[in-house]
Amino acid sequence: MNVLLCYINTLNRFYDISAVEVGQHFYWQIGDFQVHAQVLITSWVVIAILLISTILVVRNPQTIPTSGQNFFEYVLEFIRDVSKTQIGEEYGPWVPFIGTLFLFIFVSNWSGALLPWKIIKLPHGELAAPTNDINTTVALALLTSVAYFYAGISKKGLAYFGKYIQPTPILLPINILEDFTKPLSLSFRLFGNILADELVVVVLVSLVPLVVPIPVMFLGLFTSGIQALIFATLAAAYIGESMEGHH
């Protein structure tokens, strides 16, 4: 009898897992347009966290830095090092862009694990990390594409497009395809990792609600930070490559 009850409980848990929805969305109707409300709400929360924390720390800088000031200075120095390593000596103007990408993605990824999005009920779907949605990651990747095209054209003018026929014009289609695959690889890598992490946690919580999901959540926090670093580093590398030439 006990074996039968355990079997039934296991089936019930798998039934609960099957009810987990990935594609449900909540939209706002603005005129003739449907706006993806989930992504906007969570993105605004992440932006608010970044703005408020920055204002609180830097509005009154101290001669002897506070712990918060030390942290922000360390983050800025870290972003400068990444930008300089990937872009070169002309990295200065690109530090704000690379830093914004890194901080937004980092806080977005961590918000999926640390913020209780589930307590906010929506008519359809549920709130999650902004980077859990392909719309966000594609938008970030397209911004990166615009940035490295701008970097190359602003430095070399129309001669920038000469890279597409180097080292031989036969490679023109491949070189063009490469520029299209860069944003795709950036967006799908980030989206896939964050979505997979959240789904694994949901499944484990459904099966074993107590202790087992905790190590996975800590691993998710670590990989979320790594994904933010990878995205920012690759964005800086693409910008540096467009300014230096085709490699």
Swiss-Prot record:
TM region(s), chain numbering: 38-58, 95-115, 134-154, 199-219, 220-240
Domain of life: Eukaryota
Keywords tagged on the record: ATP synthesis, CF(0), Chloroplast, Hydrogen ion transport, Ion transport, Membrane, Plastid, Thylakoid, Transmembrane, Transmembrane helix, Transport
Molecular function GO terms recorded: proton-transporting ATP synthase activity, rotational mechanism
PANTHER family xrefs: ATP SYNTHASE SUBUNIT A, CHLOROPLASTIC
Family indicated by similarity: Belongs to the ATPase A chain family.
Protein name: ATP synthase subunit a, chloroplastic
Gene name per UniProt: atpI
